[in-house]
Amino acid sequence: MPNTILKLERIRKDLELSRSIRQTIIPNLSLSIERGEFVTITGPSGSGKSTLLYLMGGLDKPTSGSVWLDGDELTAKNESEMNRIRNEKIGFIYQFHFLLPEFTAVENVSMPMLINGRRSRKEIRDRAMMLLDLVELQDKYTNKPNQMSGGQQQRVAIARALANEPKVLLGDEPTGNLDSRSANNVYQLFDRLNRELQQTIIVVTHDEAFANRASRRIHLVDGQVAYDRQLRTEASVTNEAASLVS
């Protein structure tokens, strides 16, 4: 379907514990993500949430089955091709920000664009500053990570993930190390990116409040979808956004 950005077909993932012992993490899972969706993935520890996210992002390959992203079959790509796809089409945000400590906010956000090599130095710097403006860090351009709070560091990481205009933004517990206020700020940023830029966002989270504020929630148990629920219509998203600024 033209509106499907990510599709998983009959995915199985086994973890090889030894030559004779395998543990099945995901036994047989199929699902699709539509363009512009804001999806949270929840479930108990060991349910396969992060494994599923890494399969979606091409950081791991399934034992069997196929993963499609924006028309590319990730499971058919070699590592060189996957490096290109990850750089160009996927933005990753982790529980820890992984910012380079010796670089400023602008330099950290610039890094994926420098690797991509499709913009001039001026274009890269201009876009890095624009993205920092977008995440409301316009006064932190020259700050290094140790000169920012945890919430600010994570917002720099989000700006970095957006650097190459990814088709999909993937987050693995992005608020896990943050206090409740900073976590709420990150949620509101994701919500704004989704509403205003129609950015497709998929986030693994243990945070129930965060999980239920997305437009769709997928809950895993033992590597299988226990439920897949639409949480909000476009109208309810607009009404909630209005209440936040009223």
Swiss-Prot record:
SUPFAM superfamilies: P-loop containing nucleoside triphosphate hydrolases. SMART domains: AAA (SM00382). Its main location: membrane. One of its GO terms (cellular component) is plasma membrane. InterPro entries: AAA+_ATPase, ABC_transporter-like_ATP-bd, ABC_transporter-like_CS, MacB-like_ATP-bd, P-loop_NTPase. Residues 6-244 form the ABC transporter domain. Pfam families: ABC_tran. Part of the ABC transporter complex LolCDE involved in the translocation of mature outer membrane-directed lipoproteins, from the inner membrane to the periplasmic chaperone, LolA. Responsible for the formation of the LolA-lipoprotein complex in an ATP-dependent manner. The complex is composed of two ATP-binding proteins (LolD) and two transmembrane proteins (LolC and LolE). Belongs to the ABC transporter superfamily. Lipoprotein translocase (TC 3.A.1.125) family. This is Lipoprotein-releasing system ATP-binding protein LolD 1. It comes from Chlorobium chlorochromatii (strain CaD3). The gene is lolD1.
